[in-house]
Amino acid sequence: MNSAYHSPDMSQRIPGPAYSSSAPPPPIHTYQQHQHPPPPLPPPSQHHHSSHPPLPPPPSAPHPHHQHPPPPPPSHSLSSHQHHSQPPHHQSQLPPYAPAPYQQPQPSQYPRPHPHQQHAPSPSQHDEPPPPPPFSGPSPTDHQKDSEYVPPSYSKIEEGSGWKYSLDVKQQPVRARMCGFGDKDRRPITPPPCVRLVIINTETGKEVDYNSLDHAMFVLSVDLWNHDGTKEVNLVRSSTGTGAMASSSTYTYSSLEPGTPSYQQQSLPPSRESGYGQSQGLNYGQDYPPPVQQSYGQAPSYPPSSSYGPPQQYYPRHSGYSAEPSAPPPGAPFRNGYGQDQNALTRMAVVGGQPQGMFTRNLIGSLAASAFRLEDTEGQSGIWFVLQDLSVRTEGTFRLRFSFVNVGRPGGQGTNVNQGRAPILSSCYSESFHVYSAKKFPGVCESTPLSKKFANQGIKIPIRKDANIKGEGDEEMYDQN
């Protein structure tokens, strides 16, 4: 009886602990399915004997969990497992862990299981940086190639003779000191550009005999271009009327062509009659004539203290100017270059003492050169153009463009001059050179062997003395030959 009585008790006790041990799993699964109530239950499930006492805290614990239902279920399952792993070590700290789920910035705790997921995207992030290095590598080299780009040269076969002309710049310009807008202080480009003319007979494919060639009608012209060789900058306009240039801006001849009719409008009588009285209200002084206003409308106004004084002499009486619109203007005021033709204005721009805002040449000096038969440093005879008298008014980086023209008759001999148009048979650009201000100018270049060779043959090239090579004295010590 007793054994039979104990058997049911043991059967009841055995299932009891078994049921108690099996009871925790259902709440775990229910916790995984239902996110709100379970958090307090799992810790008691792990502690078999303490499962009943911690039941009072659960009512307070579910509230934080009710506050944090938004996180995804897998995250709660992970957090639940973490809570299951933490409480066994601290049984008395179950209530403090209740706020811990409230601080579910458990990204700090999640990275422990997720490091594998974080390391997975990291290679993708490390895969992105590799593309930039190859892209950044060639880019600077490409920019350098673009900066070193030299415009292509041009050559043409002359009709009648069948000769092909080309230019070869043997001596490139390097640097120069800006000469400003005065005509007294001239600073030539150093070293002087030396261009060799190459003539090839298309029938034989060889160069012609330069010793028997008549080069009297060969002319080389020069103009100034920007650093890239994409735009000519032959004209410059100063923003001040003083000798020292405060600022300047370069222009091209083509950019001024649309404004040419404004020069012809100067001589219209109606503009003079009404324009002179209105000029006072247009920030022009009473002593300044309207033709200047019309032809240089974009220029800043002339201050009363300006050194531009000729109009004061040409227009002593204001009433006389408006009463006789035709007589005074063609007489006095236009004799200094304010003529009706555009060429007079161009000549006036070259002459010094111009008012502020007037256009003038940026490249000055001998802009055309005749050909010479000279021997180079190797003793070979050839046709050369030496441009030793070139100066630039403004500071910057420029190029020179050389254009060759044969002004003689095609196929003619002697001094037959072409009365028509002479086509450009060849052109080329020099390398870029820099024009420095007076303070930044490092000094003139030393005389090259080619310059000395040409100077010994009678070409007037400034040759630097040997005593000045070491820097003694100033740069004006030359042998002009």
Swiss-Prot record:
Its main location: nucleus. Residues 1-157, 241-339 are annotated as: Disordered. Component of the velvet transcription factor complex that controls sexual/asexual developmental ratio in response to light, promoting sexual development in the darkness while stimulating asexual sporulation under illumination. The velvet complex acts as a global regulator for secondary metabolite gene expression. Component of the velB-VosA heterodimeric complex that plays a dual role in activating genes associated with spore maturation and repressing certain development-associated genes. The lineage of its organism: Eukaryota, Fungi, Dikarya, Ascomycota, Pezizomycotina. One of its GO terms (biological process) is sporulation resulting in formation of a cellular spore. Keywords: Cytoplasm, Nucleus, Sporulation, Transcription, Transcription regulation, Virulence. Residues 36-45, 53-62, 96-112 have a biased composition (Pro residues). Pfam families: Velvet (PF11754). Transmembrane segments: none annotated. This is Velvet complex subunit B. Disruption phenotype: Impairs production of beauvericin and attenuates virulence during infection of tomato plants. It comes from the Eukaryota. It is found in: Nucleus; Cytoplasm. InterPro entries: Velvet, Velvet_dom, Velvet_dom_sf. GO terms for cellular component: cytoplasm; nucleus. Residues 241-255, 293-325 have a biased composition (Low complexity). Component of the heterotrimeric velvet complex composed of laeA, veA and velB; VeA acting as a bridging protein between laeA and velB. Forms a heterodimeric complex with vosA; the formation of the velB-vosA complex is light-dependent. Belongs to the velvet family. VelB subfamily. Residues 160-464 form the Velvet domain.
